[in-house]
A protein has these predicted regions:
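Bacterial N-terminal signal peptides that target proteins for export
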Residues: 1-11
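Active-site histidine-anchored catalytic micro-motif
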Residues: 23-194
């Protein structure tokens, strides 16, 4: 009888789990580089080079993402955000506008130096009504206390939420969600800089 109960429970869980998995939203992660993809020579040193890891490595660093969304990754560029320019902005806007029908939301990994400019530009040029959420970090991916994985997880949660649709471009960092027009970098070193 105990075997039957375990089998019945397993079948029941299977039947209820599969439909939930099938309903996970598809989120496209568009990677541009920045500190969130940065790498240093040591976990304890503060020097690093931005844009050292691609979108696949960023997503792999947060295995819990598979529980909240189906992730598609696209590497737009892999640069420090001080090198961001209008050509990259247009490429991002086009990727979102053209990919709108195939995704339930978008997350853009980005450096914080020019995140506010990119967010504002995309807020004006993206015509997709799906959630668009920008995310970055103040510590590189190789740092002992990297904030990127937590920020990326939260950005995917926000992009997966249907209530985020139609709100323009959002920025999710440090347990906060901001509108593109309200984002300002206030410190070059503080983790809570936006």
């Amino acid at each position: 009888m105990l075997v039957f109960k375990k089998s019945a429970l397993g079948a029941l869980l299977c039947c209820f789990t599969l439909p939930v998995l099938a309903e996970l939203p598809t989120i496209t992660v568009l990677a541009t580089g920045g500190t969130i993809a940065g790498g240093g020579i040591s976990e304890t040193k503060s020097n690093y080079v931005a844009g050292q890891f691609g979108v696949d490595k960023l997503v792999e660093a947060v295995p819990q993402l598979k529980d909240i969304a189906k992730i598609k990754g696209e590497q737009i560029v892999n640069i420090g955000s001080q090198d961001m320019n209008d050509q990259v902005w247009l490429k991002l806007a086009n990727a979102i506008n053209q990919g709108c029908s195939g995704s339930d939301g978008f997350v853009i990994t980005h450096g914080t130096d020019t995140m506010e400019e990119t967010a504002y530009f995309l807020n004006l040029t993206v015509k997709c009504d799906k959630p668009v959420v920008m995310v970055g970090s103040m510590r590189p991916a190789t740092a002992m206390s990297a904030d990127g994985p937590f920020n990326l997880y939260n950005a995917v949660v926000v992009a997966s939420d249907k209530n985020s649709a139609g709100r323009g471009v959002l920025v999710a960092m440090n347990d906060a969600v901001l509108d593109a027009r309200d984002v300002t970098k206030t410190s070059t070193t503080a983790v809570t800089d936006l």
